[in-house]
């Protein structure tokens, strides 16, 4: 999911 992808974590810190 999103939180397993570093760029996605960086772009969505509120959900990760």
Curated annotation (Swiss-Prot):
Its main location: secreted. Keywords: Acetylcholine receptor inhibiting toxin, Amidation, Disulfide bond, Ion channel impairing toxin, Neurotoxin, Postsynaptic neurotoxin, Secreted, Toxin. It comes from the Eukaryota. One of its GO terms (molecular function) is toxin activity. It is found in: Secreted. Disulfide bonds join 2-8, 3-16. Expressed by the venom duct. One of its GO terms (cellular component) is host cell postsynaptic membrane. The modification Cysteine amide is found at residue 16. Contains 2 disulfide bonds. Residues 4-6 are annotated as: Ser-Xaa-Pro motif, crucial for potent interaction with nAChR. Alpha-conotoxins act on postsynaptic membranes, they bind to the nicotinic acetylcholine receptors (nAChR) and thus inhibit them. Belongs to the conotoxin A superfamily. The cysteine framework is I (CC-C-C). Alpha4/7 pattern. This is Alpha-conotoxin Tx1C. It comes from Conus textile. The lineage of its organism: Eukaryota, Metazoa, Spiralia, Lophotrochozoa, Mollusca.
């Amino acid at each position: 999911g999103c939180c397993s992808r570093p760029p996605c974590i960086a772009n969505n810190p509120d959900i990760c």
